[in-house]
Amino acid sequence: MAKQSMKAREAKRAKLVAKFAEKRAALKAIISDVNASEEDRWNAVLTLQSLPRDSSASRQRNRCNQTGRPHGYLRKFGLSRIKVREACMKGEIPGLRKASW
């Protein structure tokens, strides 16, 4: 199990990403707009840099919903490989079974 503080940190990052998503997207649109003036683009860059670091989506880490494990995460299930295997062996994931050939 991951530490509770790490889970809380990820939850805080998720809130920040949601809060600043529109503002961040608008600033990036201005920066990539070739028709905008250099001054507007530069101001957008400075404003983007002044936003909280954790408001960037790339700072988030996918974690297992049950254990909080950061590695071996499977997006399709939202779980780590270990928990997916346990659930599969119990038959809790429909249509998923152990491979044999």
From Swiss-Prot:
Xref: InterPro entries: Ribosomal_uS14 (IPR001209), Ribosomal_uS14_bac/plastid (IPR023036), Ribosomal_uS14_CS (IPR018271)
Keywords for this protein: Ribonucleoprotein, Ribosomal protein, RNA-binding, rRNA-binding
Recorded GO CC terms: cytoplasm; small ribosomal subunit
GO molecular function: rRNA binding; structural constituent of ribosome
Keyword Nucleotide-binding attributed: no
GO biological process: translation
Entry function: Binds 16S rRNA, required for the assembly of 30S particles and may also be responsible for determining the conformation of the 16S rRNA at the A site.
Quaternary structure and interacting proteins, as annotated: Part of the 30S ribosomal subunit. Contacts proteins S3 and S10.
Family per similarity comment: Belongs to the universal ribosomal protein uS14 family.
Protein name as catalogued: Small ribosomal subunit protein uS14
Native source species: Vibrio parahaemolyticus serotype O3:K6 (strain RIMD 2210633)
Organism taxonomic ancestry: Bacteria, Pseudomonadati, Pseudomonadota, Gammaproteobacteria, Vibrionales
